[in-house]
Design a protein with these regions (language model features):
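Non-catalytic signal-transmission and effector/linker regions of two-component phosphorelay proteins
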Residues: 1-67, 87, 149-173
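A general structural signal for stabilizing positions within well-ordered secondary structure
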Residues: 22, 59-60, 80, 108, ...
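Short glycine-/polar-rich loops that comprise or flank the Walker A/P-loop
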Residues: 28-29, 113-114, 140
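Structural signal for conserved beta-strand scaffold positions within catalytic alpha/beta enzyme cores
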Residues: 33, 70, 118, 144-145
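Conserved phosphotransfer microenvironments
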Residues: 42-45, 51-54, 65, 70-78, ...
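Conserved catalytic or regulatory cores that recognize and/or transform ribose-phosphate-containing ligands
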Residues: 126-128, 135, 162, 170
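As written
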Residues: 130-148
Length: 173
């Protein structure tokens, strides 16, 4: 019968656990949502926004959901950005597509290191924005479509976390 070295097994399991703990060092903790009053109402109307976001995170065994701060315009966004750090800025483009693009550019000039993602209401809006991709790509990193589910916000946060953690995670794991 082969002798099993329990100490060796324990060290290997402990090492695997330690590596797992070191994966994903960057987490999105603070999100600034810029959406006009109508779009903010639409997002909240779909249900208990904060509760649903937290629920999405819990379903994936993620226990720290990001905190959302919502503002209605560029002025409000700049005010909040002066007060504290945000990991991610989500700009909602409703009927008016030009104002969110201009807002994004102004914010990028002042805060070039904060990722900005755009959220549109439907696929037609997506087509419009993709046709002017060169114009928005200077400040907006990616465009997502609001389909009535809060899961899109989880996807946006995970997109940024994966992008930032990619290099470190592939070296570790």
């Amino acid at each position: 019968m082969e002798k099993i070295d329990l100490n060796k097994i324990y060290k290997r399991k402990k090492s695997d656990r330690d590596i797992f703990q070191e994966l994903m060092p960057f987490k999105v903790k603070e999100i600034l949502l810029i959406a006009n009053y109508y779009d903010s109402y639409t997002i909240e109307r779909e249900g208990q926004f904060s509760g649903k976001i937290f629920g999405e995170y819990l379903q994936l065994n993620l226990f720290a959901a990001p905190r959302f701060t919502s503002v209605a315009n560029e002025e409000g966004a700049l005010h909040e950005l002066k007060k504290r750090h945000f990991d991610l800025i989500i700009i909602m483009a409703g009927l008016d597509k030009e104002t969110p693009i201009l807002t994004s550019r102004h914010i990028k000039e002042l805060y070039p290191d904060i990722c900005q993602l755009m959220l549109v209401n439907n696929n037609a809006d997506l087509s419009y924005l993709l046709s002017s991709e060169k114009e928005i790509s200077e400040s907006i990193e990616r465009v997502f479509v609001w389909n009535g589910s809060t899961k899109v916000f989880l996807a946006m946060a995970k997109y940024l976390e994966d992008k930032i953690n990619l290099e470190a995670d592939t070296k570790l794991g």
